[in-house]
Amino acid sequence: METLDYRFEGHTAVQFPRGAVLVGVLASGNLEILLEPAALDGAMTVRIITAAKGFGSVWQAVISDFAQRHPLRDVRISINDAGATPAVVSLRLDQAVETLLAGEPR
């Protein structure tokens, strides 16, 4: 297992309709993503726990791209990965933000 941590300055304030947003299913062989409100002085943090070692540069690229598209303020993102491709990671991250902004459980 490998743990990767990232921090980005956020610009977009969001309101959580409930305590957290969870998308994906780890048992599916992909990943699960949890978004939680957190007092981070306007930042967004991302912690990735992955079974695939040695892909830090790929994760950095995917997460940096996400942070440019969605610079969320005071949000903690936790990703539990079981070998998802970068495209699936991006899709799930966008799904999590869409779910958060829609305020609907999925």
Swiss-Prot record:
<dbReference type="InterPro" id="IPR023439">
    <property type="entry name" value="Mal_deCO2ase/Cit_lyase_ACP"/>
</dbReference>
<keyword id="KW-0597">Phosphoprotein</keyword>
<dbReference type="GO" id="GO:0000036">
    <property type="term" value="F:acyl carrier activity"/>
</dbReference>
<dbReference type="Pfam" id="PF06857">
    <property type="entry name" value="ACP"/>
</dbReference>
<protein>
    <recommendedName>
        <fullName>Malonate decarboxylase acyl carrier protein</fullName>
    </recommendedName>
</protein>
<keyword id="KW-0963">Cytoplasm</keyword>
<comment type="similarity">
    <text>Belongs to the MdcC family.</text>
</comment>
<dbReference type="GO" id="GO:0005737">
    <property type="term" value="C:cytoplasm"/>
</dbReference>
<comment type="function">
    <text>Subunit of malonate decarboxylase, it is an acyl carrier protein to which acetyl and malonyl thioester residues are bound via a 2'-(5''-phosphoribosyl)-3'-dephospho-CoA prosthetic group and turn over during the catalytic mechanism.</text>
</comment>
<dbReference type="InterPro" id="IPR009662">
    <property type="entry name" value="Malonate_deCO2ase_dsu"/>
</dbReference>
<feature type="modified residue" description="O-(phosphoribosyl dephospho-coenzyme A)serine">
    <location>
        <position position="28"/>
    </location>
</feature>
